[in-house]
Amino acid sequence: MKLIDNVNNRLGDDLKESIRKGSKLSIAASTFSIYAFEALKKELGKIDELRFIFSSPTFVEEELQKQSRQFYIPNIVRESEICGGEFELRLMNQLNQRAIAKECSRWVKEKVTFKTNKHNNQMLNGMIHLKNSEEEAFAYANVHSFTTSDLGITHKKGFPTLIQKSNFPDSSAYLDWFNQIWNNEEDLKDVTKRVQDYFESAYKENSPEFIYFITLYNIFNDFLDD
């Protein structure tokens, strides 16, 4: 087992070294960011597929949401992490965001399937499983989100990081766990189309969804820092 603290060694660097042409990725995490994609763009372009599970409800329709979407600020903020979390947005240019989102959108359509946990009270553990062959695979446990901060590329506020990397055959237990959840249609929902639509909104200039999020971000920026 190898320990990654994102100080002496970084998750992003380890993934760059471990991903091969034809790799298969399985990720369970709270958020997915286009800037994490950009950081690993060369490597992610070589994979065969990515299966991604949002560990808590994301892009899930709720009855009351139809009545007044402004009451669902936490959900909107979580979904907005796809185009960069609040800390990433301060570091990245918004015009550059559209270009990255467009490139990421094409990649997602080719290689990614997104599902989400339906239950607020049953958050899943975060992890990454990387399979290169039948006898070469790695698992990364204790990965909260798929963002540049969790990759160790940008600074992360709060508690220190400690990710455990396991090699084959120990990594197989994580893939088995992921597969059991992935195939659970009762508790997961496929949101691939919703995510693709969100990407398209993000890179279309002056789209209503993009303006809506930026407005919310500016209004609640100080509140989110507390």
Question: How would you name each of these model-derived features?
Answer:
Residues M1-D226:
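PLD/PLD-like phosphodiesterase catalytic module centered on the HKD motif
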